[in-house]
Amino acid sequence: MHLEHLVTEQPNGQSANLDALGIPDALALMNREDAGIAARVAHALPAIASGVTVIADALRAGGRLIYIGAGNSGRIGYLDALECQPTFGTQPGEIIGIVAGGFAGITESVEDSDTLGRQDLDAAGLARGDVVVGLTASGRTPYVLGALRHARDTGCRTIAVACNVGSEAAALADVAIEVDCGPEVLTGSTRLKAGTAQKMICNMLSTISMVALGKTYGNLMVDVQVHNHKLRRRAIGIVSQAAGVPTDVAERALEQAGDRPRIAILMLCAGVDRAGAERLADAAGGSIRKALATLAPSTRA
């Protein structure tokens, strides 16, 4: 499909007089347009669920999650990948983001190269068993199309995230996540509604994949990495809430657990030492809920 025919490139009748509006009215217009994006993303939930399953299965088997895109789309994937290690304790390199031309994306022309998409995946050590998520608002960015083709040829599972329905990217993917965001307030500026939709989708793909892998207990980030005072206080609060103990008890357990909330919670809930908690976690694939379910009621603290 030619660029000028894409929904994301069409003029938005609601904002035809954008430059004549006062600041409050212009902001209200943008807010109204943005407000409908979550409902549009909701139509793609079945496809997003399929994507989560693919990602969780790959990570469980030792594969990686690789986001790849150009411009704003690529930066959204890069930022989502960047947050996974401190939030969920993923291993370095387990979830990565690749942006055409690097994060700064100074040379916009690189998105026109399908060869560069393949080369960047190879430079990242693409291997069978990885999952590649191609992010492209238009659904036709050559850099992303080349990356998806190469990933598919390598034997990787592929997911396309696009903001135009019936896209070329979708045809190259095992899972096609397409959201019709409608025309942008600023014609063709897909960093706006399309970017918001892509951010929502990436949030769901990574977060619910981590939930499926046992990286949470309830809605608590039990693998959060403790790198500063704020995160330490947060980790203490997580242990306190999960184990139902005062914060001073939670703090001592966290120290004994080597600053790992998951282990501290198991120590307190199962009444075991650090080594015992680590064994419980390993036997349950890291899931606190599954680990506690293996204990007799009388052994739970």
From Swiss-Prot:
InterPro entries linked to this entry: Etherase_MurQ, Glucokinase_regulatory_CS, MURQ/GCKR, SIS_dom, SIS_dom_sf
Pathway as given in its UniProt record: Amino-sugar metabolism; 1,6-anhydro-N-acetylmuramate degradation; Amino-sugar metabolism; N-acetylmuramate degradation; Cell wall biogenesis; peptidoglycan recycling
Any Pfam family matching the protein: GKRP_SIS_N
Catalytic activities: N-acetyl-D-muramate 6-phosphate + H2O = N-acetyl-D-glucosamine 6-phosphate + (R)-lactate
Keywords: Carbohydrate metabolism, Lyase
Domain of life: Bacteria
EC category: lyase
Every SIS domain range: 55-215
One of the GO biological process terms: N-acetylmuramic acid catabolic process
List of catalytic residues: E83, E111
A single GO molecular function term of this UniProt record: carbohydrate derivative binding
NCBIfam families found in the cross-reference section: N-acetylmuramic acid 6-phosphate etherase, PRK05441.1, PRK12570.1
PANTHER family: GLUCOKINASE REGULATORY PROTEIN
Entry function: Specifically catalyzes the cleavage of the D-lactyl ether substituent of MurNAc 6-phosphate, producing GlcNAc 6-phosphate and D-lactate. Together with AnmK, is also required for the utilization of anhydro-N-acetylmuramic acid (anhMurNAc) either imported from the medium or derived from its own cell wall murein, and thus plays a role in cell wall recycling.
HAMAP family: MurQ
Note: A lyase-type mechanism (elimination/hydration) is suggested for the cleavage of the lactyl ether bond of MurNAc 6-phosphate, with the formation of an alpha,beta-unsaturated aldehyde intermediate with (E)-stereochemistry, followed by the syn addition of water to give product.
Subunit structure: Homodimer.
Homology family: Belongs to the GCKR-like family. MurNAc-6-P etherase subfamily.
Protein name, per record: N-acetylmuramic acid 6-phosphate etherase
